[in-house]
Amino acid sequence: MERRRVVITGLGAVTPLGLTVADTWQAVRQGRCGIGPITQFDPADQKVKLAAEVKGFVPENYLPKPEAKRMGRFTQFAVVAAKEAMADAAFTLAEGEEDRCGVIVSSGIGGLSITEAEHDKGAEKGWDRVSPFYIPTAICNMAAGQIAIHTGFRGMCSCPVTACTGGTNAVGDAFHYIRDGYADVMLCGGTESAVTPLAIGGFTSMKALSQATDPNRASIPFDAERSGFVLGEGAAILLLEELEHAKRRGAKIYAEFVGYGATCDAYHMTAPRADGSGGAKAMAIAIADAGIQPADVDYINAHGTSTHLNDAGETAAVKSVFGPHAYELAISSTKSMTGHMLGAAGAVEAVISAMTLHDGFIPATINYAVPDPECDLDVVPNTGREKDVHYALSNSLGFGGHNGSILLKKWEA
């Protein structure tokens, strides 16, 4: 089978750092922290008071009010990000092309806030008062469905629900789908809006969340004092395109998509294998998929959640794949800025990795203060770097043992 080349020609994002890719990337370059007090509900009776919320998002600024009302917040984020990606790519669907264009967008939890509100309504007023729009607005796949409706893309439309790896699985699956000839264009990514009492309570009970009260010491990947992740929200959508298709229409190109690997730990519901072997295999598969050597990789956007098990295990995985080169490459976690956006995380980090290659700038791991001997690689502490990057790897590791890695290459015409 012919392996076609795939490039990234459009980017869209709604994140705790900004409502566009440009604003988000500027914040990343500045090392700005998007974490703050929870405002979407009163967290007085919660142990966790901080989250990485999207600020200033008014859906009616982007969507007709009747449409916006029939979408969950996670779907609104995704549709807005998709619109930005389409505009950024200057892509207009040509007649007869609909079946060669598809959508893959992940969400880990979907419309949880809608479920909470409709449950309360039903319990208080009777279950026949539950909204007929509850199910179609809350289900995880509706973000992908609404993007297809808004764009007219009639090829494959799907929603990987693989927890924190979902965004990476979505973009990786889309890459393979184009590479192997099943589509020419794919909108792909992830979205999440789970800053709710139930989600915060559930993750807190698992001891997964940081209970820090200082936003600058809450999400601290690879730091010896890390104590859990900070829940984030938002979306990112990438427009992937077969290279010749992009060239024919004179599209600008951010980066080339060259590798994808996915594995499963098959070990535990929430904990990764301590040796990081599942994540290591995903990285190795992505590198082999691209046909390069580990020493060719300059930068890794780590999963880096700020939990003890993840960061130590991911460090071990990187060492096992890269050997001595692990100490020569840069590995940073932008979750130090965005928090952990669950099903959107891998997609946002794919956008950041594409911008890293395009702009020649490696993001920092901000708020890093106390080195951990278990995480002794170059984590780009506190200050990003201007550097020409040729290959960037982005990792995601999710509950259920899901591991995913994507490999992007600097575009050289």
What are these regions (language model features)?
Residues A78-F91, C140-A143, A148-E192, V230-A251, ...:
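Active-site-proximal alpha-helical scaffold in enzymes
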Residues I8, V21, R29-T162, T191-I200, ...:
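Conserved beta-ketoacyl condensing-enzyme motif
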Residues T39, Y182-M206, S210-S227, Y260-A274, ...:
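Acyl-CoA/ACP chain-elongation machinery
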Residues R5-T9, R32-G36, D214-A290, Y299, ...:
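Condensing-enzyme catalytic core mediating Claisen C-C bond formation in acyl metabolism
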Residues E124-S131, N169-G172, H176, E192-R248, ...:
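Glycine-/small-residue-rich "gating" segment that lines the acyl/pantetheine channel
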Residues A85-E97, H245-G250, M283-Y299, V321-H325:
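Phosphate/pyrophosphate-binding loops at sites that engage ATP/ADP/AMP, CoA/4′-phosphopantetheine
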Residues M1-E67, E244-E256, V351-T365, K409-A413:
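ACP-dependent fatty acid/polyketide chain-elongation machinery
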